């Protein structure tokens, strides 16, 4: 019960983060977003590491784990977050969300080759649904720049080429980073919530170091500081929301199985759509095709992360179908 509640809270804050990003990039730039959101997360993780008593792990963490976590930090928080902000600025959180969910496919592919994961029929169905979500969204007249006769033009016109390009880059970065993190944590005995928080702190520190190098140039620092209070507010929200959501996810995984936590966290698309409707209605595209695309991707993500055993135990399936679902490769 506790694990499910923590996972649901993580999904909700991930959704809030997407909405806050959208508001921030309306008036600010991607570089400004990185300059605010990354430093905001560091003190939160430091306090969490102190409270959890996980800082002692720094003494026993192998050098290889430090390098893997640092690589994950640069990949996720610099490359991935930059691409996330660029894609969200170009075409909104609703359209990029299904593409970002395809990062699960990247994670699964890497896990099969490096962490001895397997491919099952249920996961294949999930991959097909995840890939189909963005295609369904493209059927929207508003996305294609068309409106019905007599209808007013959409307030927001997406830049599809830029948006999808950076959304794919974001999915690749977000898909690779969990493998780096998992590989790093496999090198230590304690892989509970404390280890995860310390791993996040190392990853954030590496990303912050790269950010500092970027801001050393005076013109970059001036640009980062040239934002109004409203923009700084929304970017600060993104830093807080994404940091809290990551910690909640690690806490959920510490007290509940992955098969319970991961499908619940994938419901972030529902929260992203709901919060976006209330906060960013004029800056997003909401129509039937887009919502169907979002829903298809969420179902696919849940299928991709659920274990076959949990499905067979939950649903009374015919023996032949249950046997088919248990097929695995390699």
Predicted regions and their residues:
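Short hydrophobic/aromatic, small-residue-rich stretches within specific transmembrane helices
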Residues: 7, 200, 262-266
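Residue-level recognition of pore/gate-forming positions within transmembrane alpha-helices
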Residues: 14, 38-42, 101-105, 127-130, ...
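Hydrophobic/small/kink-forming positions within alpha-helical transmembrane segments
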Residues: 15, 46, 74-78, 104-109, ...
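Interfacial helix-capping/hinge residues at the ends of transmembrane alpha-helices
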Residues: 17-22, 84-85, 96, 104, ...
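Short alpha-helical packing/oligomerization segments
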Residues: 250-267
